[in-house]
């Protein structure tokens, strides 16, 4: 099998988001994949994704409430309505690679002097880009929530900062079986 990978000159951003969603849809159509997992902080990327992926099962994974500020959910009510009205599913849950051990560190960061295993895994995935780490992590989070099957391929979309810049074809698995998750294809990612 031969497939094209698109590399972006810079991470994140609106232009990359449009291209990432377009490339992901094209590959989903080619492979017959009907489930899309997408990361979204405030909901802007999610609102765009449900528009692009009409007729698909779209699972949007958000930050936890309190991620940036106590008792605050960054995903806006306006974007939540757009996503839900278009049939999208919103999952708000703890980051798979940054759990309870983060409470030991300053400002919710890694606890000194050593890193927990989730941090090591996250940093390793970031060697391929922040979007790659995000796409793998949200797929596992969706599997834990029972929103995706572990025996079917999905397209998982992540990004760097704001917007989407990475799309992967992968077979998800649960967090407790994280190393069984399989990245089958890279559709696009930034070159850094």
Place the predicted regions along the sequence by residue.
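Glycine-rich phosphate-binding "P-loop"
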Residues: 1-26
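N-terminal active-site beta-alpha-beta segment that forms phosphate/nucleotide-binding
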Residues: 26-76
């Amino acid at each position: 099998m031969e497939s094209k990978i698109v590399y972006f000159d810079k991470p994140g951003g609106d232009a990359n988001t449009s291209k990432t969603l377009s490339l992901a849809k094209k590959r989903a159509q080619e492979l017959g994949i009907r489930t899309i997992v997408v990361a979204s902080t405030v909901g802007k990327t999610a609102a765009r994704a449900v528009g692009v992926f009409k007729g698909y099962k779209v699972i949007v994974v958000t930050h936890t409430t309190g991620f940036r500020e106590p008792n605050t959910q960054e995903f806006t009510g306006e974007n939540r309505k757009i996503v839900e009205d278009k049939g999208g599913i919103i999952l708000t849950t703890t980051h798979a690679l940054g759990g309870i051990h983060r409470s030991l560190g300053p400002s919710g960061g890694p606890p000194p002097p050593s890193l927990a295993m989730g941090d090591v895994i996250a940093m390793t995935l970031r060697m391929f880009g922040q979007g790659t780490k995000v796409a793998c992590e949200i797929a596992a989070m969706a599997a834990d929530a029972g929103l995706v099957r572990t025996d079917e391929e999905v397209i998982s979309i992540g990004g760097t900062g704001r917007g989407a810049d990475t799309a992967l074809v992968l077979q998800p698995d649960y967090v407790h079986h994280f190393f069984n998750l399989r990245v089958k294809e890279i559709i696009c990612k930034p070159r850094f």
